[in-house]
Amino acid sequence: MAEKKIRNLNKKLEVVQKGFANGVATNFPLTEKQKEKMIEKATAAYAKFLEALDCDWQNDPNSADTPRRVAKAYVNDLWAGRYTAMSPITSFPSDGYDGIVIERNIPLTSMCSHHHQTIKGVVHIGYIAGEGGQVIGLSKLNRIVELFGRRGAIQEQLTSAIHNAVDKVTGGNRGVIVTVVATHNCVSCRGVKHDGASMVTTKASGVFRQNTNLARKEFFDSIKINNGGHQI
């Protein structure tokens, strides 16, 4: 029963084609045995990649286990959101609370789909439950960020994915707003090579879409983005 609930929840949240970098694996979710098999295949492939770059990884003591380390990092950490399902989300009656629920500075680790460089930053999430509606367990917002962050990503699409997931699990809400503030290693380590630049993206629905709405102002006043990309 629990496994069915997990599958139904994850099916509800996913909208991207399976197999895409920002989607889930074609046979999602993977069992531990399937993950180990994937790690073995990726290890062999990454070894060939290093050899193509004229890296003698087998005789270099600092690179001898690099192919497997990289494969494990992708499957278990960097792209874990593509392979591991999220647990069921617990919701509770709002008990008449009609204000904003805001969680600020949720840590984000993701990866640029273009160059496979890390994206690091924070996510701010706000929502207002509908009349007689439900609020969700606070840590579930963090888990949603992990689910969609731990895979290949374009920040604009990632912001939409997080917003849409929160919107679905807080059904009947009056509005959802998500702001992502992040730095991209593909900007600082290659190409233009600029350190310190951060990207800010926001997606809003319901009452938060109206610039004159006090709820929108309250959210942005609460997160107070400064030049460093974090709450003041």
Spell out what each predicted region is:
Residues 2-232:
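A domain-level signal for the structural core that forms small-molecule/cofactor-binding pockets
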